[in-house]
């Protein structure tokens, strides 16, 4: 019979240590860094309970909570009761308390600031909330745009439902969005007017913010006479570019059903067509957030058509985020990775690419030179030179 080992000193027994009140010694004996272990567990808790943050952000956008605070004036802070008073009358006496808890959560993510003041005769404290620096991107600016629509899109039912099919897609193949809705996201837009409205607003708002920064920083539009915007939508990007460079003749190229709704823009001609078939000729071709929608095979078709449409020394100006080859933990690295997984889940073959992958595509399409020019608000402006 095997002999059961015993300790010559009963106090060495872990259970005895606990019973004798030496639990701290017991923990240190079995865990050399209990503080680090606690921090890791706390981080794990944050991950396990992370869903409320994006959903509270979505609700804050829908209720315009940040806009209400902004309207109060620069550096002003409002209590939840004051914010609730600015909402449409809903008849809910608990609204201030609910808003306080939601805004408290946003304060932990540095979306809003918070100052606790003495509640006076009511006892306790009253928390007042202001806008943290990041909040301005979720409040409509002078152009009427913000990232709020992007939150409404990503947290909307059409996209949220797709995530339920991610496991199935990993095991069996396919695109989660298509599995839920029976079609890809681009065709789905034609069946759901509300989704189409939110999608277009999200793309328009982000594009407006980015292109205005690009025209201030990127000097490659100089000396271009004819610029083709592939996938240009309603032509807003060319409106901004040509207003800054009046000598440019803009060709806004998109699908016919998109172009038919495009407004008249001085200096811009709207042309309907299919980028997989052919692309109008120009001195330069502009593509912002087009390649990330498609697989490498589809991107090569697009880029080869661009190559055919350009003169010698012509260029394609590509604006895309660049994945970093080794994961980092910066806000931008997380944003790009999150977008990449969104593309995997929602888009037919779309993905975010590394700079090396963009260079490989450029060379495979026949371009002689790949030139990353400048970094603008998370996006790279890259030139593919013929």
Swiss-Prot record:
Q: List the disulfide bonds.
A: none
What does the record give as its pathway? Aromatic compound metabolism; Alkaloid biosynthesis
Catalytic residues as annotated in Swiss-Prot or TrEMBL: 292 (proton acceptor)
Annotated EC? 2.1.1.-
Q: Tell me the enzyme class.
A: transferase
> At which positions is S-adenosyl-L-homocysteine bound?
207, 231, 254, 274, 288
Q: According to its UniProt record, which reaction does this protein catalyse? A: dopamine + S-adenosyl-L-methionine = 4-methoxytyramine + S-adenosyl-L-homocysteine + H(+); 3,4-dihydroxy-5-methoxyphenethylamine + S-adenosyl-L-methionine = 3-hydroxy-4,5-dimethoxyphenethylamine + S-adenosyl-L-homocysteine + H(+); 3-hydroxy-4,5-dimethoxyphenethylamine + S-adenosyl-L-methionine = mescaline + S-adenosyl-L-homocysteine + H(+); 4-hydroxy-3,5-dimethoxyphenethylamine + S-adenosyl-L-methionine = mescaline + S-adenosyl-L-homocysteine + H(+)
Protein origin, superkingdom:
Eukaryota
User: What keywords appear on the UniProt entry?
Assistant: Alkaloid metabolism, Methyltransferase, S-adenosyl-L-methionine, Transferase
Is Ligase one of the keywords? no
Recount the biotech application: An heterologous biosynthetic pathway of mescaline is reconstructed in Nicotiana benthamiana plants and yeast cells expressing Lophophora williamsii genes TyDC2, CYP76AD131, OMT1 and OMT11, thus providing a sustainable production of phenylethylamine-derivated natural products.
Q: Which residues bind S-adenosyl-L-methionine?
A: 254
The family this protein is said to belong to = Belongs to the class I-like SAM-binding methyltransferase superfamily. Cation-independent O-methyltransferase family.
Could you give the subunit structure recorded for this chain?
A: Homodimer.
Instruction: Give the function comment from the record.
Output: O-methyltransferase participating in the biosynthesis of natural products derived from phenylethylamine, including mescaline, a natural hallucinogen potentially used in psychotherapeutic treatments. Catalyzes the O-methylation of mescaline para hydroxyl groups, using dopamine, 3,4-dihydroxy-5-methoxyphenethylamine, 3-hydroxy-4,5-dimethoxyphenethylamine and 4-hydroxy-3,5-dimethoxyphenethylamine as substrates.
State what protein this is by name. Answer: O-methyltransferase 11
């Amino acid at each position: 019979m095997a002999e059961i080992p015993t300790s010559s000193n009963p106090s060495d027994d872990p259970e005895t240590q606990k019973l004798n009140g030496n639990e701290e010694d017991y923990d240190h004996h079995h865990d050399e860094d209990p503080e680090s272990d606690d921090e890791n567990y706390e981080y794990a808790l944050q991950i396990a309970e992370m869903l409320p943050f994006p959903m509270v952000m979505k609700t804050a956008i829908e209720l315009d909570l940040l806009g209400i605070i902004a309207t109060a004036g620069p550096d002003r802070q409002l209590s939840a009761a004051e914010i609730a008073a600015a909402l449409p009358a809903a008849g809910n006496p608990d609204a201030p308390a609910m808003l306080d808890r939601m805004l408290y959560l946003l304060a932990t993510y540095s979306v809003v600031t918070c100052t606790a003041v003495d509640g006076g005769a009511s006892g306790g404290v009253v928390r007042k909330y202001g806008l943290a620096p990041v909040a301005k991107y979720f409040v409509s600016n002078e152009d009427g745009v913000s990232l709020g629509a992007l939150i409404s899109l990503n947290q909307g039912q059409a996209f949220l439902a797709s995530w339920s099919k991610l496991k199935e897609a990993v095991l069996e193949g396919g695109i989660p969005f298509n599995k839920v809705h029976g079609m890809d996201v681009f065709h789905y837009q034609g069946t759901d007017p509300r989704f189409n409205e939110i999608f277009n607003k999200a793309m328009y708002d982000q594009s407006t913010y980015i292109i205005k920064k690009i025209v201030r920083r990127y000097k490659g539009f100089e000396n271009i006479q004819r610029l083709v915007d592939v996938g240009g939508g309603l032509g807003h990007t060319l409106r901004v570019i040509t207003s800054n460079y009046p000598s440019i003749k803009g060709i806004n190229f998109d699908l016919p059903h998109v172009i038919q709704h495009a407004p008249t823009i001085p200096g811009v001609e709207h042309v309907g067509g299919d980028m997989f078939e052919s692309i109008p000729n120009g001195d330069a071709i502009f593509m912002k957030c087009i390649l990330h929608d498609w697989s490498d095979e589809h991107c090569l078709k697009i880029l080869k058509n661009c190559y055919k449409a350009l003169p010698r020394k012509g260029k394609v100006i590509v604006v895309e985020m660049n994945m970093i080859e080794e994961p980092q933990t910066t806000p931008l690295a997380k944003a790009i990775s999150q977008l990449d997984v969104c593309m995997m889940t929602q888009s037919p073959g779309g993905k975010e690419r590394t700079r090396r992958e963009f260079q490989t595509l450029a060379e495979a399409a026949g371009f002689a030179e790949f030139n990353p020019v400048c970094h603008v608000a998370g996006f790279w402006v890259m030139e593919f030179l013929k």
